[in-house]
Amino acid sequence: MIIIVTGTPGVGKTVASKKLSEALNLNYLSLSQFVIENKLYTEYDELRQSYIIDEDKVKEELEKIISTSHLVIETIYPSLVSTADLVVVLRKNPFSLYNELKGRGWADIKVAENVEAEILGVISQEAREAFKDKVCEVDTTEMSTEQILNKILNKQCDGPIEWLVDTKVQRFLEELDKIISSYENDI
């Protein structure tokens, strides 16, 4: 069995993935750690404080593990995983997510790009394109780890979640775009 837990940074993937793997007695794999430990990246982006992954190498190495294991895979790149029985996309209210990421001390550009990705449903869309009806979206806003885990185990999906129906979120997106645009010369 392969379960992918995905979503933008700050939505609760790590804790939920680890708890889910324990509850189902499956191995846990953080794809980010896997990439770093196996040097499956091409460079480090100083501005975003992130590694640029080598997608082909990641897919190749991941395939070796998937073919012989039962896993919960935590990732922001669901389409790099070739197969899954369930794909859980964790979502979070953009205002709450913004505060979470700012609290981590991340650069403004990194916060803005990740919150924008959440608002636009970038990871959700990627998951749906790759895995169609195997996708379950869960809104983690103001939920405990136990509540999130119960929703996943009971396949109580909230999605698809559309943040842009809220005019406050639309205005927030415009503000995020201004932040991102201010870095255009650095990108």
Curated annotation (Swiss-Prot):
This is Putative adenylate kinase. It holds the Pfam family AAA_18. It is an enzyme of class 2 (transferase). InterPro entries: Adenyl_kinase_AK6, P-loop_NTPase. One of its GO terms (molecular function) is ATP hydrolysis activity. Its EC number is 2.7.4.3. The keyword Transit peptide does not apply. Keywords: ATP-binding, Kinase, Nucleotide-binding, Ribosome biogenesis, rRNA processing, Transferase. Interacts with uS11. Not a structural component of 40S pre-ribosomes, but transiently interacts with them by binding to uS11. It catalyses: AMP + ATP = 2 ADP; ATP + H2O = ADP + phosphate + H(+). Residues 103-113 are annotated as: LID. Broad-specificity nucleoside monophosphate (NMP) kinase that catalyzes the reversible transfer of the terminal phosphate group between nucleoside triphosphates and monophosphates. Also has ATPase activity. Involved in the late maturation steps of the 30S ribosomal particles, specifically 16S rRNA maturation. While NMP activity is not required for ribosome maturation, ATPase activity is. Associates transiently with small ribosomal subunit protein uS11. ATP hydrolysis breaks the interaction with uS11. It comes from Saccharolobus solfataricus (strain ATCC 35092 / DSM 1617 / JCM 11322 / P2). Coiled coil: none annotated. Belongs to the adenylate kinase family. AK6 subfamily.
